[in-house]
Amino acid sequence: KVAVLRQSIRDFQTQKALLTVPYTRTSHKQFEYKTIELEMDRPMKVIDQQIYDRAAKSGFPRNFFQESYFDHVTLYCMPDNANCNFSHFSDCSFHVCRLYGVKFWDTRLYGCEFHSCRIEFTLFPDSTLANTHFRDCSIHSAAFLRSRMTRCNTVDCSVGRLNFNGARLDGCTYGRITRLPNSRIEGLEDASITMGGATQEEVRYNRNAIFHALGEQDPEHPPASRDRPPGPER
């Protein structure tokens, strides 16, 4: 058991060292996919673990990640600037994966986890994230423009630039966050932060906790002003 554990640690360290190295394999080979229609007249390619592993080994074909249904897949590599627009990720894990310039436009991520990932210039506009968590990730820059996030947790992550303009955070939590140099949080004060079924006091507490975890001051709850004591009479 000790030998297995040591090998697992070595494999993890090897994979993590590759986070700064772009994935560059390409392929013109197309796979035979099953299709599924979750919306009328919008068929999606069904990607399982076997198809993903084969593509990762030989090189991802064009539009592999776009308009695709990923079902219980562990993703450990992606090409830079991958296009995941209009795709659906169900119970997937992004494990020690480099995401650089990846686009999740109008994408669904249900029950997913980003674990020990390096995330840079990645966009989630108009996407839905439910029960999707970020753990031990380095999030250098990401935008959740108009994203709908439900019960999503971000824990033990370092963050640089985040944009929450127009986002809706319902029952989301942030904890043990480290701010990177030159970091900036945008749009958080205008995001809709709610908790379904919670009291107004619980919602206020959660909102304050999110701002505090991200190192931001909530404009709705500015710090109490302290009156300066009067100076001595002259």
Sequence positions of predicted segments:
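Tandem repeat scaffolds
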Residues: 4-222
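Non-Sec secretion/translocation targeting segments of pathogen effectors
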Residues: 1, 224-234
